[in-house]
Structure formats: C-alpha cells, structure tokens
Amino acid sequence: RREVLLAGIGPGSEALMTQEVREAIRNSDFLIGAPRMHKAAAACIKREQTEGELPDVKTAYQDFEVEEALRLHHDWQRAVILYSGDSGFHSGTRKLAERLKKNGCSFRVLPGISSVSYFAARLGISWDDALLASAHGCEFDAASALKSGCRKIFLLTGGKNGAGELCRRLTESGFGHVKVTVGEKLSYRDEQITEGSAKSLCGREFEPLSLVLIEEENDER
C-alpha cells in the first residue's frame, strides 16, 4: 500500500529535523518540495544513508502540482512531501491535505520545529502569549493589532511585505517606538538577528523570508 507523508522539516538546518522526519526521508522513494527543502533532505541523506538507492526528487510548490504528480506516478510507494517549519503553522500542508482528502488519498502528517518556536528559543522568551501571523503572500495590519491591545506579535514576512517595509508602516502609524527583532536565515550558519525600534529599522533591507518579533513595551499606550 502506498504511503504519502506530509513532513515539516523545521526552520531549515538539517540538524533541526525531527528523527521521525529523518527516517521518512531516508526510507522514501520519492521527495517533493521546493529547492530549499531538497537541499536539507540531501544533507540528511548524505549523513545517514549508507546503502541502497537514493530517492528521486521533484520540485513542486502548489498543492495541485503535488496532487498531479502523485496521481501520475503510481510506482511511488513511499512519497514524502517536504514543507518548511512545522506542518501546522502557515504551511502548504493545509491546502494539500484538503485536496488529498477530497480525492480520497490517504496520507499522514509529520510535524516539525516551527520558525516561531526556534526564534523564541534563540531569544530566550516564550511565545504562548503572542499573536502568530503571516504577511508572506498576504496582508497583515500590525498597527491595528497593536492598537487593539496586542503586545507581542510574531510575524512571517516575505515579498513586498518585508521587515523593512513593515517597520516603515509601523512608524507611519505612530508605532515607531515599538521594539522589533528580525530573524534572518534562522538556524543556518549565516543566521542574523537584528534588534531595534521600528523607526530605526525603517526601510532597511532584510532577507525576503524573515521572521519578525514586534513588542510593545510602553505601558502608557
């Protein structure tokens, strides 16, 4: 019986993959995902696989692309679809899971370490009192969230909604004073963490896919 696994590989570094995901990759005959996911999987295989054939790979991003690939290749007995971070936090897992369910395809989801969990740990703080949101490929009004009383926000950024642009919007909305911490290339060797006020970081260039922590520390607001 064919096994389809939707796996979260963690924030990026191969070292932060769960053992369950490592084993799934090692025992797969086909891997599907974005190039960055393939790179992490290749590092895992290189480290752990000592014999046998390497799995084939296919680059696919959209849920319909993955579903089509699975439909066309009945010879795949153990296909693993790779997603960054955790499978349940702003992941492509949701759309693919809905599509597979609709088409009667059985699958299993393997969780991973989320970028938020990793970033919070690096900063030595908790995240259970924070709002988790995304501005990657969608709009999110951080200023409105702060006005409504939210004091801590973890925000995924990307595309036109980068960290520098976020800080510009916050400053223009009267929140130039809030503390902003930007995590770039989290978990990689060239990881960079930058901290400052929204005003001081306004318009700066950051990695397209960065994670931002916004903190309102002014008790008078």
Regions found by a protein language model. Give the residues of each.
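Class I S-adenosyl-L-methionine
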Residues: R1-R108, I113, S117, S210
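A contiguous loop/helix-start segment that scaffolds small-molecule binding in enzyme catalytic cores
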Residues: R2-L6, R78-A79, G149-R221
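Short gly/pro/ser/thr-enriched loop/turn and capping motifs at secondary-structure boundaries
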Residues: H38-A40, S114-Y118, E139-F140, G162-A163, ...
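Short, well-ordered secondary-structure micro-motifs
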Residues: C44, T93, F119-R122, A143-A145, ...
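Short amphipathic alpha-helix with an adjacent loop that forms part of the alpha/beta core around
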Residues: E67-H74, A142-S148, K199-R204
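Short, hinge-like loop/turn segments at secondary-structure boundaries
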Residues: R99, G124-D128, S197-S200
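Short, glycine-/small-residue-rich phosphate/pyrophosphate-handling segment
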Residues: A120-G149, G158
